[in-house]
Curated annotation (Swiss-Prot):
It comes from the Bacteria. This is DNA replication and repair protein RecF. The keyword Transmembrane helix does not apply. GO terms for biological process: DNA replication; DNA synthesis involved in DNA repair; double-strand break repair; SOS response. The RecF protein is involved in DNA metabolism; it is required for DNA replication and normal SOS inducibility. RecF binds preferentially to single-stranded, linear DNA. It also seems to bind ATP. GO terms for molecular function: ATP binding; single-stranded DNA binding. Signal peptide: none annotated. Transmembrane segments: none annotated. It comes from Sodalis glossinidius. It holds the Pfam family SMC_N. ATP binds at residues 30-37. GO terms for cellular component: cytoplasm. SUPFAM superfamilies: P-loop containing nucleoside triphosphate hydrolases (SSF52540).
Length: 364
């Protein structure tokens, strides 16, 4: 699976771009502020319905323009398979239109299914040293792409938790919450089981990849479901009713789950250097993408912003070799071509980005 064509209109500082893309490596080279990260963000938005640098739609629409428009052509990688066209537009009011093969009315989740991707940015350390929500997102990405019923269950869980938290401000007895909990409890257990199963299944891939990237450390991974593992979730909700009512939110549940990572028994953020943390982040993203390939034959896109950040020459070369081994489509941004010369025998296309203008510089 690869994007063979990308069209961008009025996104960030890019007025218009129509790019024919390589199935392997695509390099975006330009000075800071030139727009190379905007290209990566356009691809990410096409597959997620939102940007990775801003949650506000208006901030990614080019100045004084009413909307942004993104289009892509997805090649399945099979000679006999038909290509799929996808599109996303959004105006300043936040109204979106998702198009697949020319028809409207589709959902962003359908784009995400068609375009699985892994993002590596200088801000991506939050996966390791940020709050649990970032690691829940890591697990949920895997569950979304491996469990057909996950997205519906996850959406219903969010809705029920929101309703339950609102009800906690109004009720005086637990019995008044049962209408929500009767639906919430089986959903919570199902989602927790999916996350636990996914965490256990991907552990071998993560361990093997981390052994290549950080052989000097013994790394341990553990899934925490968000409530005491010895407790029945339904009984816990009833037992913690007064506490939840005082807090006005549900204090325990799958929305509090975490995926903890330790090095030599210590939280990784307390022992690893910035360069080592980036390698670990890359290892996790690569392992997750490769697990998807092993499980169902689908390949991720890898988006890597500021390739050289935090990495010395040896580590850049190691990352490049592992990316090549995935046989996936990769997009890499760099300030100069010198920063990507560590990718051995690189094949693909190099684009020059300057003040929002994108031009093909070379093709190997």
């Amino acid at each position: 699976m690869a994007l063979s064509r990308l069209m961008i209109r009025d996104f960030r500082n890019i007025s218009v771009a129509d790019l024919s893309l390589a199935a392997d490596f695509n390099f975006l080279v330009g000075a800071n502020g030139s727009g190379k990260t905007s290209v990566l963000e356009a691809i990410y938005t096409l597959g997620h319905g939102r940007a990775f640098r801003s949650l506000q739609s208006g901030r990614v629409i080019r100045h004084e323009q009413p909307e942004f428009v993104l289009h892509g052509r997805i090649e399945a990688g099979n000679v006999d398979a038909r290509a799929t066209s996808v599109g996303l537009s959004r105006n300043r009011l936040g109204d979106s239109t998702v198009r697949i093969d020319g028809s409207d009315g589709h959902k962003v989740a359908e784009l995400a299914q068609l375009l699985p991707m892994q993002l590596i940015t200088p801000e991506g350390f939050t996966l390791l040293n940020g709050g649990p929500k970032y690691r829940r997102a890591f697990m949920d990405w895997g569950c979304f792409h491996n469990e057909p019923g996950f997205f519906t269950a996850w959406s219903n869980l969010r809705r029920l938790l929101k309703q339950r938290n609102a009800a906690l401000r109004q009720v005086s007895r637990y019995q008044q919450l049962r209408v929500w909990d009767q639906e919430l409890i089986p959903l919570a257990n199902r989602i927790s089981e999916w996350r636990a199963d996914y965490s256990a299944a991907i552990a071998a891939d993560i361990t093997a990849t981390c052994a290549q990237f950080l052989p000097e450390f013994r790394l341990d991974f553990s899934f925490q479901r968000g409530w005491d593992k010895e407790s029945d979730f339904g009984e816990l909700l009833e037992r913690q009713f007064e506490r939840d009512r005082a807090l006005t939110y549900t204090a325990s549940g799958p929305h509090k789950a975490d995926f903890r990572i330790r090095a030599e028994g210590v939280p990784v953020e307390d022992i690893l250097s910035r360069g080592q943390l980036k390698l670990l982040m890359c290892a996790l993203r690569l392992a997750q993408g490769e697990f998807l390939t092993h499980r169902n034959g689908r390949r991720c896109l890898y988006l890597i912003d500021d390739f050289a950040s935090e990495l010395d020459t040896g580590r850049r070369r190691l990352l490049a070799e592992r990316l090549k081994a995935t046989h996936a489509q990769v997009f890499v941004s760099a300030v100069s071509a010198d920063q990507i010369r560590d990718i051995p025998d690189e094949k693909g296309k190099m684009f020059k980005v300057e003040q929002g203008k994108i031009s093909l510089q070379s093709e190997v």
